[in-house]
């Protein structure tokens, strides 16, 4: 199910890029000369920053999975990009909420209504060090700490 959603979003992005590139080709001159994108522009486009990304509504609002939404995904700004060092990754420093009007369709498909849904967008991004431990490893460590804090009764020495 998730793979199908991702594939659908991928196709939508691909279609958008195809339309954009066709317009760019027809707007340019008919010469066979290729334009070279300068390094500074390449770096600026690929460096850690908020970028638009299609996100599934059901992933952002998991308590609403019993309904169908149209559109099923929305365009949100998310931190993405390269940091120039393998020890760093792109993370959000500041977020902001955005409210969008979405068509909400119940399972029986009637009556559907327009609803306002709030989503979180990344506004400011920064390259930060990657933490070595994963969330699962931190949970295991926390569980062990809790166990060791519980008082243990000792048997009296006779």
UniProtKB/Swiss-Prot annotation:
Q: Which UniProt keywords apply?
A: Angiogenesis, Developmental protein, Differentiation, Disulfide bond, Glycoprotein, Growth factor, Mitogen, Secreted, Signal
Full protein name: Placenta growth factor
User: Which sites carry carbohydrate?
Assistant: 29-30, 97
Q: Which SUPFAM superfamilies match?
A: Cystine-knot cytokines
Where is this protein chiefly located? secreted
A Pfam family found in this protein is PDGF
Q: Which source organism? A: Rattus norvegicus
The family this protein is said to belong to: Belongs to the PDGF/VEGF growth factor family.
Q: Does the keyword Secreted apply?
A: yes
Task performed by this protein: Growth factor active in angiogenesis and endothelial cell growth, stimulating their proliferation and migration. It binds to the receptor FLT1/VEGFR-1. Also promotes cell tumor growth.
Q: Which GO MF terms does the UniProt record name?
A: chemoattractant activity; growth factor activity; identical protein binding; protein-containing complex binding; vascular endothelial growth factor receptor binding
**Where is this chain compositionally biased, Basic residues type?**
137-148
Q: How does it assemble?
A: Antiparallel homodimer; disulfide-linked. Also found as heterodimer with VEGFA/VEGF.
One BP annotation, GO: positive regulation of cell division
Task: Please state the span of the N-terminal signal peptide per the UniProt entry.
Answer: 1-23
| Taxonomic lineage | Eukaryota, Metazoa, Chordata, Craniata, Vertebrata
